């Protein structure tokens, strides 16, 4: 719940001097990205901007306090201010910030700017007291904000110091409007206006000018002179003499002498107690000060000119001028030290009564009242946890004695979930075990269930499937239906364990149940997680169209609940990319991988490993080895600088091994094979993938026998567990093993089964990636004309993609290759004495790639008759009569040059 006063522009007070010269300068504010008002306290920054803002409708105002250093709180108020300015134009951003479904402040702002793209009118956002921000993450985000905000938007920042917002760059580009303390200082004319409306007796212009010069135009000093003159019934000149030599550092003494000591005891007590409130209204004042009719008291303080500011048009909310408020709080600690805890307790109770638990916690912490803090947390902590107010929760729990936590197991559970959310898995079990051992109260069965559900989540995160399964089942037996969150967690873990153990049908049913429960209780991140798991299971079963439809449902949920910036969104984009890659929709697959990397752009670079592996995979499918190598360099750097789950390493290793296969890098494959772990089982698609990597490396090294043993066992497991996508992949690798070891009949049998299975999976690129060896076999099958219609169509599509992307043979016949070939000692004498032209070498490469005459003509953009002439000439020079002879001749030349064909 947001405090309304923090979003209200200050009310324009009576008897204030209208700063015409500065307002004239600000009239062109919409031409700048940033308007920066900087000066020490008391120079009239807020008053000036409130005068300028009067009458502007498309303007949001955000008044900061120390608590806004929490990123989530800062984001909530900033988006609320924008919504105020735009009439709720940015609904998606508001939903994201309310549910804390954004990856970072920068990514939230990026979403905000997308929504503001169709906002046509000038838009202003005022942030007051920016000097209170000391969180570097917020500074970074606001620099991003300034770089990317719409052209029709102006940010207005008020600060006592120069904020860390990349101001120099804006200044150079003439995108910064600055007003500093020298410009804010009152002129002689403004000082005269000020005294004329504040003093009962007029003051001469010369005297006014001299007073202005004495205090260097400092508005607070002029206000204090006028206040002192009124309170003491003395002249302004007399007050000024007493003020001579006073500056901000000595102001405290002056305020004691000239303000506090000149009000009655009741008012003094009111000022000191109320200063502990960062903002105040009638109810808060009555509870904290004990005075009746708090609103009337506030208005009286305002009338006396005691530095009280209205914060909204209704006049309900007030706050002290920052300079005066800081002074009063210091005096309160001196003069009311004994009463201080009780005052803070009263403030906390009043904030709670108005529904602001975060503000109440601030005062409970200040009071040092562990019992009150405990009670607030017991009633409101889980709501705060669900709204990601994690920093304040952590601070609050740390302030509670361990004995208090032991008496309240739900708070221990909360602390454990905080650790889990920060990936401090080992600490979770340590905390829960210690609590159970030392707890004086008897935990009921439901609480045991809550503990076990969390332990199950930690166990599955840690890869301990058996313990995760045991704990999740125990939790589900212990938990009543009312403990829906823990039941969702335990059910999800149970489904994930079944998935890992290859029990796909059961896992699918459990994940569907998890989705229903999560949707029923609006636990959207678990709903999304369960749909993603369903898609993975369907993919593993070979039902890729059904997996696609699950993903569509997940994308719809992401849009509806504004989950675009959750890291889990990257997981969804990644599995969509994998599916698109399988179907040879490479541009779309690469776009999804890039989107996934964008979602994680504000996290550690290591988090992008899986999407980066997909980028490599797309390049490999295109036959673009240079680009693949470029991505691989980054991928291998990330692998060497992080600790990853075995599944992540397996996916990264997959593209590395394929790259080594394509480039014939046996040394790299051998080194990797010596070091890579060999899993004990292969009962899920994660482990199947790692064993397939091993088999591929063994085939590259010519170790056919151990590779065959691996693949036969993989296929046995895949058939029994119905891992049909893995079976499809395994058959293709087995085909390559048979082909390279000269077992052509067995190779054809494996390929035919793989083609049939692809009718279900839709696989294209898993064939394409095998390159020329696959192309040769498909050409033979197509020429035999014995394939069923679907398989024939797929074979033609695969061959077309291989010819399009895998031009090793075509690329090999470039000028550099031909020059090396002609200088090779074993080159046939016929080629040396009667060399082909460069165009004829190109035609030979395309013939070898399986192109027809018409396709070659289209590729080289020449007439078909010209191609026939080139073919006739190269046949004559090579001494061959038929197309197949030319293909065999090209193959022999490539082998002679060391290319694995």
Curated annotation (Swiss-Prot):
It comes from Klebsiella pneumoniae subsp. pneumoniae (strain ATCC 700721 / MGH 78578). Positively regulates the transcription of the maltose regulon whose gene products are responsible for uptake and catabolism of malto-oligosaccharides. Specifically binds to the promoter region of its target genes, recognizing a short DNA motif called the MalT box. Monomer in solution. Oligomerizes to an active state in the presence of the positive effectors ATP and maltotriose. HAMAP family: HTH_type_MalT. The lineage of its organism: Bacteria, Pseudomonadati, Pseudomonadota, Gammaproteobacteria, Enterobacterales. One of its GO terms (molecular function) is DNA-binding transcription factor activity. This is HTH-type transcriptional regulator MalT. It comes from the Bacteria. The keyword Transit peptide does not apply. The gene is malT. Activated by ATP and maltotriose, which are both required for DNA binding.
């Amino acid at each position: 719940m947001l405090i309304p006063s923090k979003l209200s522009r200050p009310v324009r007070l009576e008897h204030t001097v209208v700063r015409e010269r500065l307002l004239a300068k600000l009239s062109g504010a919409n031409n700048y990205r940033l308007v920066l008002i900087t000066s020490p306290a008391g120079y009239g920054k807020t008053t000036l901007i409130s005068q300028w803002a009067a009458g502007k409708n498309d303007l949001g105002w955000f008044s900061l306090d120390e608590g806004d250093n929490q990123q989530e709180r800062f984001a909530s108020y900033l988006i609320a201010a924008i919504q105020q300015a735009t009439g709720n134009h940015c609904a998606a951003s508001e939903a994201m910030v309310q549910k804390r479904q954004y990856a970072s402040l920068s990514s939230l702002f990026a979403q905000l700017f997308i929504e503001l793209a169709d906002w046509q009118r000038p838009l202003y956002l005022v942030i007051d007291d920016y000097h209170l921000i000391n969180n570097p993450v917020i500074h970074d985000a606001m620099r991003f904000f300034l770089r990317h905000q719409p052209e029709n938007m102006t940010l207005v920042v008020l600060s006592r110091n120069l904020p860390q917002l990349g101001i120099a760059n804006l200044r150079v580009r003439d995108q910064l409007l600055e007003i500093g303390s020298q410009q804010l200082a009152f002129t002689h004319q403004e000082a005269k206006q000020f005294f004329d409306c504040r003093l009962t007796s007029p003051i001469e212009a010369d005297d006014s000018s001299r007073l202005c010069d004495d205090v260097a135009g400092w508005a607070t000093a002029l206000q204090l002179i006028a206040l002192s003159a009124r309170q003491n019934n003395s002249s302004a000149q007399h007050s000024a003499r007493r003020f001579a030599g006073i500056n901000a550092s000595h102001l405290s003494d002056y305020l004691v002498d000239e303000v506090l000591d000149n009000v009655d005891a009741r008012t003094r007590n009111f000022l000191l107690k109320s200063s502990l409130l960062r903002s105040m209204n009638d109810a808060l004042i009555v509870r904290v000060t004990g005075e009746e009719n708090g609103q009337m008291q506030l208005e009286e303080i305002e009338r006396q000119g005691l530095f009280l500011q209205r914060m909204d048009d209704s006049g309900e909310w007030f706050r002290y001028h920052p300079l005066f408020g800081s002074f009063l709080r210091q005096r309160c600690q001196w003069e009311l030290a004994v009463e201080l805890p009780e005052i803070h307790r009263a403030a906390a109770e009043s904030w709670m009564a108005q529904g602001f638990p975060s503000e109440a916690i601030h005062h409970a912490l200040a009071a040092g009242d562990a019992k009150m803090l405990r009670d607030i947390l017991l009633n409101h902590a889980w709501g705060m946890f669900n709204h990601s107010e994690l920093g304040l929760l952590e601070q609050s729990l740390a302030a509670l004695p361990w004995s208090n936590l032991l008496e309240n197991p739900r708070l221990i559970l909360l602390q454990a979930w905080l650790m889990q959310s920060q990936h401090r898995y080992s600490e979770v079990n340590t905390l829960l075990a210690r609590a159970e051992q030392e707890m004086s109260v008897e935990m009921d069965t439901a609480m045991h269930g809550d503990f076990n559900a969390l332990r199950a989540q930690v166990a599955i995160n840690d890869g301990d499937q058996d313990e995760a399964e045991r704990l999740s089942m125990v939790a589900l037996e212990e938990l009543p239906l009312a403990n829906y969150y823990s039941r969702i967690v335990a059910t999800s873990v149970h489904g994930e364990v079944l998935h890992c153990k290859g029990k796909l049908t059961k896992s699918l049913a459990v994940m569907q149940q998890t989705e229903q429960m999560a949707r029923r209780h609006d636990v959207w991140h678990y709903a999304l997680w369960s749909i993603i798991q369903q898609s993975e299971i369907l993919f593993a079963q070979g039902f890729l169209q059904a997996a696609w439809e699950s993903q569509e449902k997940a994308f719809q949920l992401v849009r509806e609940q504004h989950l675009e910036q959750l890291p889990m969104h990257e997981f969804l984009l990644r599995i969509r990319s994998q599916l698109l890659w399988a179907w040879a929709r490479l541009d779309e697959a690469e776009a999804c991988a890039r989107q996934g990397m964008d979602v994680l752009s504000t996290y550690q670079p290591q988090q992008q490993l899986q999407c980066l592996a997909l980028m490599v995979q797309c390049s490999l499918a295109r036959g673009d080895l240079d680009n693949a190598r470029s991505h691989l360099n980054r991928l291998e750097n990330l692998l060497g600088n992080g600790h990853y789950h075995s599944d992540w390493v397996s996916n990264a290793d997959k593209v590395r091994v394929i790259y080594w296969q394509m480039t014939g890098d046996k040394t790299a494959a051998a080194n990797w094979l010596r070091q890579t772990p060999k899993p004990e089982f292969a009962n899920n698609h994660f482990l199947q993938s790692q064993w397939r990597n091993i088999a591929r490396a063994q085939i590259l090294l010519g170790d056919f026998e151990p590779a065959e043993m691996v693949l036969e066992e993989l296929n046995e497991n895949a058939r029994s567990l119905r891992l049909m996508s893995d079976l499809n992949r395994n058959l293709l690798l087995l085909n390559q093993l048979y082909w390279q070891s000269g077992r052509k009949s067995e190779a054809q049998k494996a390929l035919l089964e793989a083609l049939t299975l692809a009718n279900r999976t839709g696989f294209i690129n898993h064939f394409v990636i095998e390159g020329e060896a696959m192309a040769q076999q498909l050409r033979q099958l197509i020429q035999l004309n014995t394939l069923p219609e679907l398989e024939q169509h797929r074979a033609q599509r695969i061959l077309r993609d291989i010819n399009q992307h895998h031009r090793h043979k075509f690329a090999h016949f470039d000028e550099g290759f031909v020059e090396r070939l002609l200088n090779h000692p074993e080159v046939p004498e016929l080629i040396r004495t009667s060399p082909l032209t460069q165009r004829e070498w190109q035609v030979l490469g395309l013939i070898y790639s399986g192109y027809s005459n018409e396709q070659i003509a289209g590729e080289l953009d020449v007439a078909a008759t010209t191609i026939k002439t080139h073919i006739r000439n190269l046949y004559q020079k090579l001494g061959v009569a038929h197309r197949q002879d030319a293909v065999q001749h090209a193959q022999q030349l490539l082998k002679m040059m060391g290319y694995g064909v």
